[in-house]
């Protein structure tokens, strides 16, 4: 239930709200049979459901902290659920989590030193040092990495980055668009420690500015993955991100940054995947920060480090840097103080003792390595297991308000909305929690007047073509009135008493005398009840798109009756329920037979009979293949053409052909056989699809990839009898008897 996108120019909050509205509409259509979407923009004079009711229900579906945009790289954004393939995988995860807990206890059990034997207080030499005194067209002449010249690339023309007087020699002033990149510095993973230090000057109170990142190009917060140092509303945010906002650790300074003066900024990350491992320092002293996120679930992509700019995002406009340094370790507070020339002995004793433990206590260092390895092991196991979307309540979710005219960016702050439901339908039980669990219990409360009626009415429509409410998508004031209200009430009550047993209700309907009566109407019934609203005859139902396809596969003997498994492409011989569907881009054949595009909830399908449907049945390769396979099947089961055609009709229509139908099909067979016999000596006849032989040189299909087409037109039948039989089978598949249930 999401309508997210990563299209350029999309607004995250707009699509987040659209997704919430879609969930409300889907739930109201599906379970209540109401068009609540009508109340999204404003109240209606005679409609008991108000705009506040809509957004109160929206609060139930908007209580998760989500980003409205998907990752450009197609990753599943948290919160998600891992789909373990076996109990062994699930048990292994529990064991790995227990190993982490044990390692954390072992680390905590190591005593803090009683005295601060600081050892060396100066940090090791940085992995990268950029004095930024001299620039050339390809980079900085004096960039050093591990004592050697560093590979250094400019992301702009030579004149875009300006040299400016720095703390030591020259620094660089950024214009918001230009920056530079360190393509070889990629030790920026979730478990890799990092320290960034530089003299920095903020030239303005930036609403948003990227100082440092390894996220690659930027399509929105939901796609930013990697390390990120960002100015936001004059404050500094330091983050390690998998996918924002639900898989990231991030902190932000409590105070705004000082402007128009040089300061030494240091940002450290210890590789723990926890917000407690992030620290920010200004002039050697730790800055007070607030935790923004503390839920890093998976690894980030390992992109190169970029400074001062980011594609499709705001760069460090009017900001300056000098003496940029990078370490592949998290410096301690003592080492950061030493960078700024502060005597470590003036620091609080707790800070000194922490440094002594991390730098001189070998037992602590070994315990830390074991803990990090346990975390890596768990992450590797979890990332090997498929994930799928889930919803989870978050205290960080935005508060819900009535939106003026339903527009995402116009909340009416005078009209806050608590999670709730339309009380005009049924009052909320205050004993229940105000969340989706409470909603589920509200919907399934035996006293709720709608849910059971909507479900039974939909089952009735499935069996009889029309519901007892013909407008099964709308049981409200604007919908049709029930033709048999007492019957609907009785079935709804029995449905609840029977434990909401769908199979039992369907069995009851199809075993009823109403369903089993003839679908051929009398003249009087046709005149009085042409639409069969009063059920004077049995139902006449046109098969759905999925039924038509599955019926052809079953009759051909090619249907794979395996239950469960991954989705497959439409050319595979699996039931249609397993066919891969892409929202907004469903298989064309399904659309032609009235299947929905799945962009929005479709509580009731159209029921059409168009020439395009006949063309699909006669010419689509899948149906042609089915016709050929049926012909091959019946040619082995019988020898007489009349018997063969009878068998084909039974396989497809599940009944014997009437005499008139059989006569017509036999005539068609005789006629086509004669014509094809005349063509056979000089021209190919009907193509026969055969299973392609495996290519011994072809590589095995990678696990999880799309299935290859199972068959192609590989040979031509020169047998006029078999070709004519194929055409007859194709005609049967396209006949009204095959696609209509009576």
Regions found by a protein language model. Give the residues of each.
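Primarily short, surface-exposed interaction patches in extracytoplasmic proteins
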Residues: 17, 48, 91-114, 118, ...
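Beta-strand-rich interaction surfaces with strong enrichment in secreted/lumenal proteins
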Residues: 183-186, 252-256, 293-294
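Extracellular glycan-recognition modules
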Residues: 123-155, 162, 173-239, 259-262, ...
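Extracytoplasmic low-complexity segments
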Residues: 87, 93-177, 186, 215-222, ...
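Short, aromatic/His-centered strand-loop micro-motif at the edge of beta-sheets
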Residues: 239-264
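Extracellular beta-rich ligand/substrate-recognition surface
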Residues: 17, 171-180, 240-248, 428-433
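Sequence context surrounding c-type heme c attachment/ligation sites in exported
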Residues: 1-90, 590
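Flexible glycan-contacting loops in extracellular carbohydrate-active proteins
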Residues: 165-167, 229-234, 286, 290-320
